[in-house]
Amino acid sequence: MKDTFEKHETGYQTNHWNRGIEYRKGKSIERVEKPTKLHRARTLGYKAKQGYVVVRARIRKGGMHKVRPKRGRKPRAMGVSKYTTGKNLQWVAEERVQRKYPNLEVLNSYKVYADGRNWYYEVIMVDKNHPVIKSDPKINWICEPQHTRRVTRGLSASGKKARGLNKKGWGSEKTRPSLGANKGRGK
């Protein structure tokens, strides 16, 4: 299944090319009927059953777009260039989708497309109040209260990666229990 989806088409008027045109015309956060990359969605926990929702998010590429101050100062004190968010753009996309759909919970996400200006992610969301989700033993952990707004606390896969929690052992002493607990010395 993966080989079918990951086969990169070259040239114009292909499905991949037309998909990009459709994404650019659409809204920045848009619900989709089914996942574009089915193999990736299933790996991350998606099932074709009630209670699962897939949302596509568009987010601009690059670091923080800081506004240049109008008043005079030394160029190094402008605070414009070389500033980054400290979190990856996939995590930012997940947070924006969570804000748009407050009754759903973010399960995971994956990159689906990129052009010169934007990244496009598909975010898998779960309706934790749906009876099908509550009765499924593989996913009903998300219905418990400690998993509320998990993405805003950096508990999704991209959030944990941005917080440096994929690294273990020597060199990662300051990443746990959190970056804040170690006064930002980690990562």
Q: Where would I find each of the regions flagged by the language model?
A:
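Low-complexity, rRNA-contacting terminal tracts
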Residues: 1-50, 72-187
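Residues forming anionic-ligand binding surfaces in small-molecule and nucleic-acid pockets
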Residues: 69
